UniProtKB/Swiss-Prot annotation:
EC number(s) on file: 4.1.1.65
List of residues that carry Pyruvic acid (Ser): S488
Subunit structure: Heterodimer of a large membrane-associated beta subunit and a small pyruvoyl-containing alpha subunit.
Mitochondrial intermembrane face of the membrane: 53-516
Keyword Protein transport found: no
Cofactor note: Binds 1 pyruvoyl group covalently per subunit.
Name recorded for this polypeptide: Phosphatidylserine decarboxylase proenzyme 2, mitochondrial
Gene Ontology CC annotation, any one: endoplasmic reticulum membrane
Effect of loss of the gene: Normal growth on non-fermentable carbon sources (ethanol and glycerol).
Length: 516
């Protein structure tokens, strides 16, 4: 920081001095010299204080595993300076442009020849029915071309090449030799807000409930996960009707705090909505202003995570819970007061005895089938949308760019299956910002960002309305889940018995339904 900037940052105050009792001009010079020395000393002390603060903040961010800045060779920094998100949106407009009918067949055949697409697998072999390149990228295949392995508990969700796979060591995924990233950076931390609840078209009927119970029994999946990604339901707390505001605050702040991005310099305390469900109106009225939901904050009316919101929109921070003695005023205070031990309550930190966490990273080339399917018989409980960059995910760049998959825009699907925790993370890439989840119409990716989001932020939606007995959306192995365009990467992180061994190897090409 330059001296002039330090001077302006310190803001010294000058005061008038009565010179009648000091002997005139000589005394005036002495006073000016004294004030100048005080300014220099104060500026130096301020610089030391700022330096210590930055070091402490860096260490705390390292403990929270949310430092995901671009790091690599000079080519990486050059690439990070390009407007890749804007280029991807322009490319998306080009892909959606309708082609003349007479150009479709030769154009798609040329593309298939260049990128090695197998046109004999198309569900609709008539190329004139594909109006544009986007329709062709998201083409459907005949079901018999992708048989699902009947034995393996985990199968490939996509067509692609395995970049890396193995065991999660010390809560980190070893991407390539010397490059790794933490699960918190990839999947996020404790959800600190009451997330959006997705409504489904299927009506809850006794037949549907029975079907879901049979699904859980057949695949040995537990019922009602009780939202393992958040703190325990505060409605179980016993609260005296005549408790004062502070006592009631302590009763409910087992839930993580959250703040709204429309006021970055103030952190507001709210009692999560789930805590109000079983409380009488008289107790509600005693919550006070600090526990009352904001009047302009309605979770039920959120229209998805569209980035084209106004400045008063609500983006939720991922932050560990911590009962604070005072209200933090900014992000630095949150980092300082964060209780890192709350990270241990995340499901991937609480695996079953005798189990381990495994991962598999599969890269999709531009000519591959661009839809992703379910890797197992599991229940998708929630999804988290991380708005990020759109770097290329090619193996060439993946070997050179640190934290590639935690820098890029992605959607993390979290849930459970027979052996415990299961997650599938479709990762966006250059020209592939659009990610679609079939059961979630509220998801909107690669939208124009009017304001850069903070580190570790994500928008979360839960699927508990899909099933009252499973608290999520049940999907079977090989069932289509969603898709993206042109080429990207899918990361699997799942829990399995310690003796689990991959039947595939690094660099192998796999197809949907094949055993991993």
């Amino acid at each position: 920081m330059r001296p002039r900037q330090r001077f302006r940052r310190f803001h010294p105050r000058w005061s008038k001095v009565n010179l009648r009792g000091f002997g005139g001009v000589g005394a005036l010079k002495g006073v000016k010299a004294l004030n100048g020395m005080n300014v220099r000393v104060s500026m130096r002390l301020k610089w030391i204080s700022n330096r210590i603060h930055r070091i402490r903040r860096s260490r705390r961010l390292g403990r929270l595993s949310i430092s995901v800045r671009p790091n690599g060779s000079w080519q990486v920094y050059l690439l990070s300076s390009l407007p890749l998100r804007s280029l991807s949106r322009v490319w998306g407009q080009f892909n959606r442009a309708h082609l003349p009918t007479f150009l479709r067949t030769p154009g798609f055949k040329l593309y298939a020849w260049v990128f090695g697409c197998n046109l004999s697998e198309l569900k609709d072999p008539d190329l004139t029915h594909y109006r544009n390149f986007q329709d062709f990228f998201c083409r459907e295949l005949r079901p018999e071309t992708r048989p699902v392995d009947p034995v393996s508990p985990v199968v490939s969700p996509v067509d692609g090449r395995i970049v890396c796979q193995g065991v999660v060591d010390n809560n980190r995924i070893q991407h390539v030799k010397g490059l790794s990233y933490s699960l918190e950076a990839l999947l996020g931390g404790i959800s600190s807000s009451n997330p959006l609840v997705v409504n489904f078209e299927d009506e809850i009927t006794p037949d549907l409930i029975q079907k879901h119970e049979q699904f859980a029994e057949q695949h040995s999946i537990s019922l009602n996960s009780n939202n393992r990604y958040r703190k325990a339901d505060a409605s179980a707390a016993v609260v005296d009707e005549h408790s004062d505001e502070e006592a009631l605050l302590c009763a409910f702040t087992d839930h993580p705090h959250f703040y709204l991005n429309d006021s970055r310099n103030s952190l507001n305390y709210f009692c999560p909505f789930s805590a109000f469900e079983d409380i009488s109106n008289s107790v509600r009225s005693s919550c006070g202003k600090r526990l009352s939901p904001s009047s302009n904050f309605d979770l039920n009316n959120l229209g998805g995570d569209d980035d084209l919101r106004s400045e008063s929109s609500s983006d939720f921070e991922s932050a560990p819970a911590s009962i604070l003695e005072h209200e933090p005023t900014n992000w630095d205070d949150w980092v300082q007061e964060a209780d890192v031990t709350d990270i241990d309550s995340l499901p991937w930190h609480n695996i079953r005895p005798g189990n381990k966490l495994f991962y598999s990273v599969i890269y999709l080339a531009p000519g591959d089938y661009h839809r992703f399917h379910s890797p197992a018989d599991w229940v998708i409980e929630s999804r988290r949308h991380f708005s990020g960059e759109l770097f290329s995910v090619s193996p060439f760049l993946a070997r050179r760019l640190h934290n590639l998959f935690v820098l890029n825009e992605r959607v993390a699907l979290l849930g459970r299956y027979e052996h415990g925790f299961m997650s599938m993370i479709p990762v966006g890439a250059t020209n592939v910002g659009s990610i679609v989840i079939n059961c979630d119409p509220t998801l909107s990716t690669n939208r124009l960002v009017l304001r850069k989001k903070s580190l570790g932020t994500f928008q979360e939606a839960v699927y508990k309305n899909a099933s009252p007995v499973l608290d999520g959306m049940p999907v079977s192995r090989g069932e289509q889940v969603g898709g993206f365009q042109l080429g990207s990467t899918v990361v699997l992180v799942f829990e399995a018995p310690a003796d689990f061994e991959f039947s595939t190897y690094q660099g192998q090409y796999v197809r949907v339904g094949e055993a991993l």
